[in-house]
Regions:
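HotDog/MaoC-like acyl-thioester-processing domains
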Residues: 2-7, 64-65, 76-123
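Generic structural detector for well-ordered beta-strands
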Residues: 9-13, 58, 102
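Hydrophobic beta-strand-centered segment that forms part of the acyl-chain substrate-binding groove
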Residues: 37-83, 94-99
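Hot-dog-fold acyl-thioester-processing enzymes
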Residues: 1-53, 107-123
């Protein structure tokens, strides 16, 4: 399978912190979903992608103010209408969060439609 990884980076600022002074999970989730969306957008037009499920999002260490959180994402599985993206976030070289999300390709009425990329992912 051809690798089509997408990398995004975010500077963790004061407004991104929780009451413990570390990256707020809600902000991390926003960036996490955005990274997965960008990976899906490599394969499917953005107007056809909707989030169905955050399968998992696990934090393994806190991310502190001033850190640069690097999120790497790629589509790892495709069904007839769905795509699963795997995301890994690291700060200072250490993995801080990881997980996966599922998107579905939809038509103009919001109904699931085949995306036609399954064969490409098998290459």
């Amino acid at each position: 399978m051809e690798s089509r990884k997408v990398t995004t980076q975010h500077l963790v600022k004061g407004e991104d912190l929780n009451h413990h002074g570390t990256l707020f999970a809600g902000r991390a989730a926003e960036w996490f979903v955005e990274a997965g969306f960008l990976a899906a957008a490599v394969w499917v037009p953005t107007e056809n992608i909707v989030l169905v499920k955050i399968n998992s999002m696990t934090f393994s260490r806190p991310v502190k103010r001033g850190a640069v959180l690097r999120l790497e994402s790629e589509v790892v599985r495709a069904g007839r209408t769905s795509l699963e993206a795997r995301i890994e976030g690291s700060a200072g070289g250490d993995v801080s969060l990881e997980g996966s999300i599922t998107f579905v390709s939809v038509d103009a009425e919001g109904k699931p439609m085949p995306h036609g990329i399954s064969a490409l992912l098998q290459m």
